[in-house]
Amino acid sequence: MRSPASSRRASALHRLCDSCRACGLSKVRCSKEKPTCSRCRRRGTVCEYVVTKRPGRKPDSRSEVEPEPGHLSHPLPSPESSTAISQGNLPDPDAFDPLFALPEPFDSTPELHSGPLSTVDSSLSSALTTWCPDFDDFFSFPVSTEDTLSGDRGAVYDGTIKHPPNLRRHSESPPAVPDDTIYLFGKPVDPAPPDQSLPATTTIGRRASPPSGRESEAGSRRLSCRCLIRALDLLKHFEVIRREAEIESSLPSIDAVVEVNKQTTEAITGMLQCPCSQKDGYLLVLLALIVCKILDRYAAAAIPGTEQGHDPTRRLDEGPMAGQRVLGELHCIQRVMNQLGPRLRMHGAQGASPGQAFHGTPAPLSVGLGDQLEPELHQRLSRLSSEIIRLLREAQ
């Protein structure tokens, strides 16, 4: 036998609606007369009062077994799994908890999920179910409390870092954690001092534009062309040799003289191949002086008594052999003079043009100086060869 409380609960659960079904569908006010309202009586329709559907638990639902709280909590990923995900070792998508998966389309309305869009929906659903952000790795990233704008405000972000290193899922190695947040404003500046020969950048993080062909060629010539310094070194070397000979009170051997003069002649030939020898008049004057030094050394080695302050009898190499050796080397000097002479005349003509002497011309040759240097070199060479030939004839 049922108790009064259970009967009242049952009657409350099965309460009828205030409006009949016909008035409810027509959305008009019902007279609430039972068993037939006045509107249904007037229309001649069936008046039916349905049972109300109250929200809430179903009766006797507490008797069912409630799920344990442990099944509803999702375990947090361990640090090992976070490291594996950050290094590119993604877990199997099928191994994810179904709580994070999107619900499948409703089966009650198949017409809404059929057609060409069903494939796109299914692919999007599968892509979203396999995505799992690594939040543990993200929150473990240290954040500096310093002001990020207190650094170099002139830095320009060059766009090479598209996302923070901790969100890279497919990197080869775990990202290096910087000490501060200055990496957000561009690449760090190299503490090493820059090369003075390279163009300096005016903005940190901005790469200098590559030089053009003409600029690079001019820069290479500026760095590699040291002809004027080499010419001065050759003159200094001749002075050192002269002072050493004075200290030793003896003349060098013919082999040493020929070897030094041959190396000097090759150096002059290399300088004449440089483009600066066609523009720099100072270099041409120095080369002419070096040629005079070479001829003087050949004369001192081949002709007895030419070198002042030394006894001709103390020469190591005497006789016609030294003259023949020097005479065989004069053709190299002749080739150098054939290249040097026209350039001396050209710069002498430029110095003779009006106004060149007062506008910073690179040619130090005054009017007629180039025309005087070239004949002087040829006269020295001609006198030396004539004297050597005379001595060789007398020795016979």
Swiss-Prot record:
Q: What induces it?
A: Expression is positively regulated by the transcription factors brlA and laeA.
Q: Which GO terms describe its cellular component?
A: nucleus
- Which region ranges are annotated with the description Disordered? 54-120, 190-218, 346-365
- Tissue note: Specifically expressed in conidia.
Disulfide-bonded cysteines: none
GO terms (molecular function) for this protein are: DNA binding; DNA-binding transcription factor activity, RNA polymerase II-specific; zinc ion binding
Q: What happens when the gene is disrupted?
A: Resulted in loss of trypacidin and questin production.
Q: Which Pfam families match?
A: AflR, Zn_clus
Feature: compositional bias, Basic and acidic residues: 57-71
**Where is this protein localized, as stated in its record?**
Nucleus
What name does UniProt use for this protein? Trypacidin cluster transcription factor
Origin species, per record, is Aspergillus fumigatus (strain ATCC MYA-4609 / CBS 101355 / FGSC A1100 / Af293) (Neosartorya fumigata)
Q: Which gene encodes it?
A: tpcE
